[in-house]
C-alpha cells in the first residue's frame, strides 16, 4: 500500500486518535473521524489550526432511517465531547460543508462552531457547489466566527 511505501521515509509521523507529536516548532494532536482517517489540531506560533478531515455529522436524512441518523449524530457528538477535553479554542477550523448530505448538510458544521470558540471557519468538501458552502457564512457569523471561503487553487488566508 502507499502507507507502506511512505513508512520508510524520514520525517514522516503517523498519528492515531489520541496520539500527538511535538517538536521545537509545532504540536499536532490527532482526534477521531466519523469516516476515514483522523482529524488534527496543529498548534504553532501561538495559533491553533484544526483540520477536520472526514470528521462530520455524516448522515443522509433524506435517505437514511431514523436509527441511522441517530447513530451518525451520536458518533459525531461523542467525538466533539472527546475533543472538548483538550481543545479550548480554535483560531482556524477547516471543516466539511458537503451538500451531498442533502437538507442537513450544514448541521455538523453548525454543531462544531457551537461547541468550540472558533475564530475563523474555512469550509471544505464543497466543490463544485461553492454557493452551498457560502450559505454557511450567516451561521458562522451568528456564532461570532469569521467565515472565509477558499474556492480557487492558490487561495490563501493570513491568520
Show where each model-derived region lies.
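Active-site-proximal segments of metal-dependent phosphoesterases and phosphodiesterases across multiple
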Residues: 65-75, 86, 92-114
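Binuclear metal-ion centers of metallo-dependent hydrolases, dominated by the metallo-beta-lactamase
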Residues: 10-19, 101, 105-159
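Short acidic/polar alpha-helix capping motifs at helix-coil junctions
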Residues: 4-6, 72-77, 143-146
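Active-site neighborhood of phospho(di)ester-bond hydrolases with catalytic His/Asp-centered motifs
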Residues: 1, 50-53, 70-71, 92-98, ...
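Core dinuclear metal-dependent hydrolase active-site scaffold
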Residues: 11-89, 152-159
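Active-site metal-binding motif and surrounding structural segment of the metallo-beta-lactamase
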Residues: 1-5, 82-94
